[in-house]
Amino acid sequence: SRAAAAWTYRNAEDFGGNPERISVSGHSAGGHLTGMLLSTDWGKNYGLPPNLIKGFLPVSGLFDLKPFPFSWLQPKLLLTSEQVLRNSPVFLKPVYTPHVMVAVGADESHEFQRQSKNYTIFLQKHGVPAEYLSMPGKNHFNIIHDFLGDGGPLCKKIIEWK
C-alpha cells in the first residue's frame, strides 16, 4: 500500500488527478493498511512530501493485532510479538497530523468497535484531528455499501472534506 500511494503521488497528473489532494480509505484489512500509511515517513523512505496523504478514512479496520496470536488464524499467520507491535497501527506514532475519520458500524462486533474507538483516541492523543464515526444500522458487511454512490453517509463525509 505504501508503494501504491507513492506511485499515485508521482503519477496522479498523468491521469487527471491532483497529487496534492490524495486521500485513502480501506475496509477491514484495508482499514489496517490505511492505518499503516499514517505512520509512514514519506520524506525519509520515499523522498516525497511528509504530508503526502491529506485524509484517511479507515472503515471497520484492524488496528490492534494483539488478539490475533490467540485466534484461529495464528497457525496460518504465525505472528510473533514483535510483528504484532510493528504491524499494529494503534502502537505506531503518526508521522504527521492529517484529517482522519475512523468509521465502524454500530452493529459490528464489540472488538471492531473497541479497536476503532481506541485507534481514534490514540490518534487524538498524538495531535491528529481524528473523528470517530459509529454508523447506525451498519455492520461489517453492509457498511461498505455507503461507497456505492455519492448519497451514502460516508461518501457525504468524504465530499465535505476540504
Predicted regions and their residues:
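Alpha/beta-hydrolase superfamily serine-hydrolase fold, recognizing
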Residues: 1-162
